[in-house]
Amino acid sequence: MADAPKEGRLTRFLDFTQLTDMASESVGGKILFATDDFFAPAENLIKSDSPCFKEREYTEFGKWMDGWETRRKRIPGHDWCVLRLGIQGVIRAFDVDVSYFTGDYAPRMSIQAANLEEEKLPEIPERGIRTGAAATPEEFEAIAELKSDDWSYLVPMTELKPGNPASGHNYFLVNSQQRWTHIRLNIFPDGGIARLRVLGTGQKDWTATDPKEHADLVAIAFGGVCVGFSSAKFGHPNNIIGVGGAKSMADGWETARRLDRPPILENDDNGILLVPGCEWAVFRLAHPGVITRIEIDTKYFKGNAPDSCKVDGCVLTTQEEEDMIKQKWILPAHKWKPLLPVTKLSPNQSHLFDSLTLELQDVITHARLTIVPDGGVSRLRLRGFPSSICLLRPREKPMMKFSVGFKANP
């Protein structure tokens, strides 16, 4: 998930909580090429954590900096790098972060992009350890096959300011609905940039999807996104639809402890806690479809997993979603259809729920995960078939039937 702009200049145009950093190393972003990495390698641009400064830290090549920093150029040209997005899709904005680069920041930059077919890409040499090095003639020859000079400009050449707290972040809106896979960052003529955040939403090519294979319809890499939640004290719900498995408890969704819990807790006859409150998160699916398998993973949440959960689904238009966001998701009960009834959860465990009868499932556009009374979840997977396939199936019953299985995490 993307952090909100610190200066607040774009908050009236974009809801940054609905965007993800498509270039981050945490989602599979990768630096393919850089003209120079003398002081600090370009891989630092796509680190998921915020840049830091170590006043007394030096390397054999000079001052240690948490970003990409090239040598002072003494030959014709300018520096640039190429990266492959970990999440490919629609770019809404860039954050060019020059934090801590106050006397050696890149004075100007521009950004280009391309939509390339993976199977047609040339072989690019692995970069390895780059500090103190410049690109070799062989690397220049390989990257030239991408013809990145001709890529579309999403940000023209623009001046940057020093990386002081008030001017470190430089935000640029992108007015394009095109799908992008690769980025070229140009700096003029040289210097340093701490981070490049490519903010947007994933976009899967559903026409290329095998209709016989399940797809995770809520995956952030395909375009799924959290559009509402009750609490996100220790982690945003977008984390639980992230790429791959959770890396730690910080990589999940965790709420604050509810204060309306009874002084003494009791269970019902099914072993479910009797409490008045709950927490919830609503997700827009990457593609409308039928859900046939649900996975709820509480890995790493050993003393703070929810007691129970349920999952509901509904069909909403874009306008209805906008209205619900304004109303904080106070949605009439009849709109939600149960996908998974109230179910007991266990700590640090993956819980699998498989549909018994696909033909009886309904198409949904949104899903709501409710946890009781509070706690944390590391991953949510909603696997099924996109609506272009499942709309051809009978839809007699709204209720989905599940068999419950548990797969313990090590």
UniProtKB/Swiss-Prot annotation:
Family to which the UniProt record says this protein belongs: Belongs to the allantoicase family.
Transmembrane segments: none
NCBIfam families: allantoicase
Annotated function: The function of this enzyme is unclear as allantoicase activity is not known to exist in mammals.
Biological processes per GO annotation: allantoin catabolic process
Protein name, UniProt field: Probable inactive allantoicase
GO molecular function terms noted in the UniProt entry: allantoicase activity
